Amino acid sequence: MQLSHFLFVAGAIGAAAHPSGHHVHRSAHLKQRDALEFVKTVHTTEAADPPAAAPAPSASPAVLKESAAPAPSPSAPAAPAYTPFCGANAKVKRATLGQILYEGNTGKASGCKWGSNLMVVDNSIADKYDRVMTYTNHDSVPYQVICANKIGPDGAMTPMFPTDGELNFSVAPGQTKTVVADINSQGTCAFAPNEIPKAENGQYAGLWIEFDVGNTSNGGWSGADCSALVAQHYGLPVPTGSVCNFGTTYCSHMLPGGTGDNAYTKGMEAEDGVGLNLNSPKVHLEISMGQY
């Protein structure tokens, strides 16, 4: 998955958008408050000649707000039969800063609840959906998985901070669970053995599986990657895992010890060209937890 430069917002460092001509556009933001907050986004784009980078604004850095942090919701039940996404045909909008803060589909259209664009469904009906993520636990202990949109319910970039509407479920050893996403959804699923640890600022750590599926602003491209940037930034454990294009060896792996193969690890904050780029109307991402 081709990715654009990171953006760092810390103290007096400004924010700038760098649109990418590659398949995926990604940025991260660090801002100074009580502690550094790590925010990372994924945004797909069709392959094209790279446009000129936008100049860094002279104004104050963009403020990335943190959503309220309620207690985690109980394990999300799996829908037993095909369930249409709420507001599936509604239009989406762009948030501020253009491509960097592209909001996409967060499920809120037509009066629907934020996060309704992501659902856990029974494995037997996965083939009824066009954008599927299957999570398989290869370890001997249960794994917690939490999925959420890149843009929070208040319209701010607050990925992987606890919030109402996130998917929160457990996968037992040897078990597979299925998450489906509506078209034009951008977000992250974090996972870890037993319980996902939190960084000192309250953000979920663990191993991140970032996804951008059926991006309607960029010709329907999809992308995904493994990222340990948050966990390694805060010195937290990095689970082993991978995300692959289903039935292929096209993967992003996180190896034991936090070493990446086509994945994001500490020191790669400014790199592009990592992860998966998929140009297909149907996407099936196969996520392995506890092995790569």
Question: What residues fall within each predicted segment?
Answer:
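Asparagine-centered strand-capping/turn motif at beta-strand->loop junctions
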Residues: 123-127, 132-143
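Short edge-strand/loop segments of extracellular domains
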Residues: 151-155
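Beta-strand signatures of extracellular beta-sandwich domains
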Residues: 144-148, 225
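Residues that form ligand- and interface-recognition hot spots within folded domains
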Residues: 137-139, 149, 183, 230
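Ser/Thr- (and often Asn-) enriched beta-sheet segments in non-cytosolic proteins
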Residues: 39-41, 144, 168-170, 176-180, ...
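Extracellular low-complexity, O-glycosylation-prone Ser/Thr/Pro/Gly-rich "stalks"
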Residues: 2-130, 194-292
